[in-house]
Design a protein with these regions (language model features):
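Active-site-adjacent structural elements in enzyme catalytic cores
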Residues: 1-228
Length: 228
């Protein structure tokens, strides 16, 4: 059970007067929407209308904690950080690390744009992007703050904000933007995995994860490319 912390969603629940069962507002495995326009672009005529409450205030999804056993653990890091929870609990809270899928977002490939995502060290982002560009890829770059002043040859560049809160809020929009601009490859790096950085790194790893083989009815919009 989830209860949103947003005046528009709370008003909807109040007006309806009951519980609401609904799927996520995006295709399974693809980049999560954080604006009403993202929902409309992805679902199109499959939905009758979109209730627009403005851009998501947090961006990354909720934190999911396993409380079914004797010891608590984080199944999916999210907007409520591990440090927030540990401050309340008064003890360390581990992140669930087994391969068993128990909750949304634990699949090896999830939150994935059409373009292939490749993760490299922050100091290698520019060099790897330019190498892929020379090989003929339409390269999109999530440029970390440490190198935002460095020119980079690429098809499209998003200069990331220095604030982890702003990064978490904008992550999915950045990935969608690079898709919309026709990139077939996205070069990115992981942030420091503390605070919201833990959730951001989790989403980027899933976005870069191995894609399931498509069925004849589910061919990829952009064929995976080899950055080497």
């Amino acid at each position: 059970m989830r209860v949103p912390d947003h005046p528009v969603a709370l008003a909807l629940l109040s007006a309806f007067g009951g519980g609401v069962a609904a799927p996520s507002a995006n295709r399974f495995g693809s980049v999560s929407p954080t604006t009403a326009n993202h929902v409309r672009a992805e679902l199109g005529d499959d939905v009758d209308f979109v209730l627009d409450g403005g851009p998501c205030q947090v961006g990354v999804e909720s934190t999911i904690v396993d409380a079914t056993g004797d010891a608590l653990s984080i199944l999916r890091p999210g907007g409520v950080t591990r440090e927030d929870l540990e401050a309340v609990l008064g003890r360390p809270l581990p992140v669930h690390s087994t391969s068993r899928v128990r909750v949304p977002g634990q699949h090896p490939s999830h939150y994935a744009p059409r373009a292939r995502v490749v993760l490299v060290a922050p100091e290698k982002v520019v060099a790897e992007a330019e190498r892929a560009h020379e090989l003929g890829h339409r390269v999109g770059v999530l440029l970390p703050p440490s190198v935002t002043d460095t020119p980079v040859k690429a098809h499209a560049v998003v200069a990331l904000p220095g604030s982890m809160a702003a990064y978490a809020r904008g992550l999915y929009g950045f990935l969608r933007e690079l898709d919309e601009r026709g990139c077939d490859l996205i070069i990115a790096s992981l942030p420091v995995e503390e605070g919201l950085g833990l959730a951001i790194a989790n989403r980027l790893r899933r976005a870069a994860g191995p894609r399931p083989a498509p069925t004849p009815f589910d061919a990829p919009a952009v064929a995976p490319a080899d950055p080497s």
